[in-house]
């Protein structure tokens, strides 16, 4: 189904979610929906030019962020998610959900009911 919208958003999962957070500091997107995107760059990924996602929120509009995160996801530990909320982002936390619970039904971590709920809430937020 085609949808008409005046809002340009970026969505991403995992590393793509981290980059969706980083995009908040730019001017190309009005909303950002990271799905289990890392709030802090993992140590192994750090290098020249690899900025922190929270730095982008500090220069952009953190209220333009709706993050979807599972509470059992080692890539997004609770303290990091708390940092994201403290920066002004809205976070949908799914109790007991692990990394990748929304986007790929073939993954062991997939949770159909939570995935459906997350997509409904994200689409409502984007439409709103």
Question: Where are the model-predicted features located?
Answer:
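N-terminal cap/leader regions of alpha/beta-hydrolase-fold enzymes
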Residues: 1-128
């Amino acid at each position: 189904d085609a949808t008409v919208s005046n809002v340009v958003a970026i969505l991403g999962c995992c590393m793509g979610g981290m980059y969706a957070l980083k995009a908040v500091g730019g001017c190309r997107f009005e909303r950002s929906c990271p799905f289990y995107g890392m709030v802090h760059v993992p140590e192994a990924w750090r290098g020249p030019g690899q900025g922190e996602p929270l730095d982008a929120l500090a220069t952009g509009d953190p209220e333009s962020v709706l993050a979807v995160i599972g509470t059992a996801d080692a890539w997004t530990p609770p303290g990091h998610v708390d940092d994201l909320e403290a920066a002004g982002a809205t976070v949908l936390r799914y109790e007991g959900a692990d990394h990748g619970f929304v986007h790929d039904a073939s993954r062991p971590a997939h949770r159909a009911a939570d995935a459906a709920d997350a997509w409904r809430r994200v689409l409502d937020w984007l439409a709103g």
